[in-house]
Amino acid sequence: MKVSLIQTNIFWADKKANLINIEKELETLTGKTDLVVLPEMFTTGFCIDQLELAEPMDGETVLTLIRWAKEYNLAITGSFIACENEKIYNRAFFVKPDGEIHTADKRHLFSMGGEDKFFSSGDKRLIINYNSFNICVLVCYDVRFPVWSRNM
């Protein structure tokens, strides 16, 4: 499986600019990769105190991710700021080329950065079988807790 990581300049709190920027990167990967890994909170940057940036699962970010996965025939993973049941989450996603999306919310919020003051933590792991690989999608600080990610 070919995996591509996109590390690019993020436009702070500017979803539209970030979506345009990421799509330009995706266009260069057409036919060259199976899975694209996007940065944490790729549409906004790490804007923990701007809760108005949070989106529901039927918002622009998710709809765009599904379109990209289908159009470019690849899987995409990363995270974005999600809102659900009046709570805000740093939500990991994995979108398959057919548009099927799976999500889980970041479990270990980074209190030293104040993330826990604005976000709610998740309680499940995201494990995807894709191209015969089992992939455990983790967001940033979650990788510091291998026992949780391995045993939960």
Regions found by a protein language model. Give the residues of each.
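Extreme N-terminal starter segment of soluble prokaryotic enzymes
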Residues: 1-5
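Hydrophobic positions in the central parallel beta-sheet of the AAA+
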Residues: 6, 36, 136-138
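Short polar catalytic/cofactor-binding loops
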Residues: 7-12
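Short, solvent-exposed loop/turn segments at secondary-structure boundaries
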Residues: 14-18, 116
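Cys-nucleophile CN-hydrolase/nitrilase-fold catalytic domain and related Cys-dependent amidase chemistry
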Residues: 15, 24-97, 102
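Short, acidic/polar
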Residues: 17-28, 143-150
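Active-site catalytic loop in hydrolytic enzyme cores
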Residues: 83-152
